[in-house]
Amino acid sequence: IAMLTYCVTAALRDAPQKDIRSLLRDRIMRPIGVPDEDWSMGYGKTYTVDGLPLVGAWGGGGYTARAVARVGQLMLHEGNWEGKQLLSKDAVRQVTSDAGTPGNCGIGWWSNNSGYCAKLPRDAFWGSGAGHQVVLVVPSLSLVAVRNGEMLEAAPGEPDLYHEPVRRLLFEPLVETISGSVTNAKPASADVEAVPLPPGVKAVWDLS
């Protein structure tokens, strides 16, 4: 990520945004409705290296759950936000697919293309930060899930891998719950054909 940040910053020499923080703010975060105070990166600092304004994009980020969810929603829709293509579809597909390197890596994202998590659909991908902060995106389920909190504990005998507790405590239970909800859906009523709702009101079904 550090090398990628350097390359992107070098490519911005003649652009309106001179650093990656400004680029992300103007091209992504503001267009998807994330307030400036809801996110930060690189500990809020900028360093000059080789005459370039470098932001430490590989760490020091702070994002609210809502901000992360909006980014996940943007990626779910392959870079499209309310009809406007902010990122090219090809770029989104490339960075969220298996890059062919160890550890289920995409480019800045993690991919389930290899089936690392057997209970997750193969099109699932996720971003993660320190302390098991995670955003999971599953296009085939139209799913975006965000997890913020403390570091998750590994189970006894569990492989010493960063994503194992996330897989066991978040990914698998979440997908099992969704699949179970679909499987256990109640049949349609023979007596009620429709229930009219006022404009703007949505129905939330309890399938328990």
Feature annotation, model-predicted:
Residues 35-53, 96-146:
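Active-site Gly/Thr loop motif
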Residues 19-28, 84-95:
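Extended, well-ordered alpha-helical scaffold segments
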Residues 13-58:
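Active-site helix/loop module of the DD-peptidase/beta-lactamase fold
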Residues 20, 24, 64-68, 91, ...:
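Stable alpha-helical elements in mature extracytoplasmic
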Residues 127-207:
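Structured C-terminal helix/loop/strand segments within mature extracytoplasmic catalytic/sensor domains
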Residues 1-2, 44-47, 68, 75, ...:
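Solvent-exposed loop/turn segments at secondary-structure junctions
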Residues 1-28, 68-75, 142:
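Alpha-helical scaffold elements that line and support the substrate/ligand-binding pocket
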Residues 7, 58-61:
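Extracytoplasmic, non-cytosolic globular domains
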